[in-house]
A protein has these predicted regions:
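Catalytic Walker B motif of ABC-type/P-loop ATPase nucleotide-binding domains
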Residues: 179-183
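Conserved ABC ATPase signature
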Residues: 154-158
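Conserved ABC ATPase "signature" region
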Residues: 24-28, 121, 125, 132-150
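C-terminal coupling/interaction segments
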Residues: 295-336
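ABC transporter nucleotide-binding domain
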Residues: 197-295
Length: 336
């Protein structure tokens, strides 16, 4: 199976104006500005096969939006090789642009003061969609996303959920092979999220649509994606299947530690932290004045309980869902 996306040694560096202190420094910066580099992406390598649905996960500032813009051809990488559907995205070739769609949840491609239908009709002409195909696809999209009564309203009068669903409709009208979704469900109600997730899964089965999805709502990732890529500080930290990610998560538990007698003070917690260093491969994800929380491999739980069974500490294993696991990963990496 040929690859949908190929990235090799991709770097993206921005140059930001240096901060200044004092009037003289500000005037100098105004006349002769100086800049400092900011590495948004560092040696990014991964491949995505055709027909895949990939969840691209990372905290704010991790490099997700920069990478999406590079994959769409909006930005060029500073260095490295990018191939999407066999094309160099930065060349913005017509053959490439006709094969992709892109929805940015915080931006609109619709004309603000005109009815949604006007934007859809215009895109029909831009992409040279046949009348019969246009009517069929528009009918399917409006029925599936509950937009029949919406597309004749001006965009400015739509709710956020209605607007995002109209954006999705616009970007699927020309039947792209690949759609990029950058935070498509941010701020949406439960019903709108469900309709979008359901339709994306339907299109994947019906027309082998490939999906590259970034979202802080991990419910989107769990519902729509088979694979996941996790990025942090511009570097890829995980690239594999959702099943592999679940196996990693199941190998760890969250352990909460507190003092049975709070009058013993922080010194006892400090003693606990020092003692835990012998295990090496555990992460402290919460360091509070009265309790500690660790991400601990399951195989070490029994040994830890045996070590601290003198009645000084309360040890509690806490439940973890997918979102908790991802958040704890980010916390453990931030301390590195």
């Amino acid at each position: 199976m040929s690859n949908l996306i190929d990235l090799t040694a991709v770097n993206k560096c921005y140059f930001l104006a240096r901060e200044t202190v004092g009037l003289a420094a500000w005037c100098k910066q105004l006349v002769k500005p100086s800049y400092e580099p900011y590495q948004a992406l560092a040696d990014v390598n991964f491949t995505v096969p055709k027909g895949a649905a990939v969840g691209f996960i990372g905290p704010n500032g991790a490099g997700k939006s920069s990478l999406i813009k590079i994959l769409c051809g909006i930005q060029k990488p500073t260095s490295g090789t990018v191939r999407v559907l066999g094309h160099n995205p930065s060349l913005r070739e017509k053959g490439f642009l006709h094969r992709i769609g892109a929805v940015f949840g915080h931006k609109t491609s619709l004309w603000w003061d005109l009815p949604v239908k006007t934007s859809l009709d215009t895109y029909k002409e831009i992409y040279k969609i046949k009348d019969v195909d246009y009517r069929k696809r528009l009918s399917e999209l409006t029925d599936s996303l509950n937009l029949s009564k919406v597309i004749h309203k001006p965009v400015r009068n739509l709710s956020l959920g209605e607007r995002v669903k109209c954006e999705l409709t616009l970007n699927l009208l020309h039947s792209p092979e690949l759609i990029f979704l950058d935070e498509p469900t941010v701020g949406l109600d439960v019903t709108s999220k469900y309709e979008i997730r359901k339709y994306l899964n339907y299109k994947r089965k019906e027309s082998n649509l490939s999906v590259f999805l970034t979202s802080h709502d991990l419910g989107d990732i769990e519902s729509c994606c088979d694979d996941a890529i996790i990025i942090d500080k511009g570097r890829i930290r995980f690239d594999g299947s959702m099943r592999d990610l679940s196996i990693i998560f199941k190998a760890n538990i969250k352990l909460n530690v507190s003092l049975q007698d709070l009058t013993l003070g922080e010194a006892r917690l400090l003693r606990f932290k020092e003692a835990m260093k012998v295990f090496g491969n555990i992460s402290l994800i919460n360091d509070g004045p009265t309790n500690l929380t660790y991400l601990v491999p399951k195989v070490l739980v029994g040994e830890i309980f045996d070590m601290f069974n003198d009645g000084t500490y309360d040890l509690e294993v806490l439940p973890m869902d997918f979102e908790n696991n991802v958040v704890n990963l980010f916390k453990s990496w931030s301390s590195e």
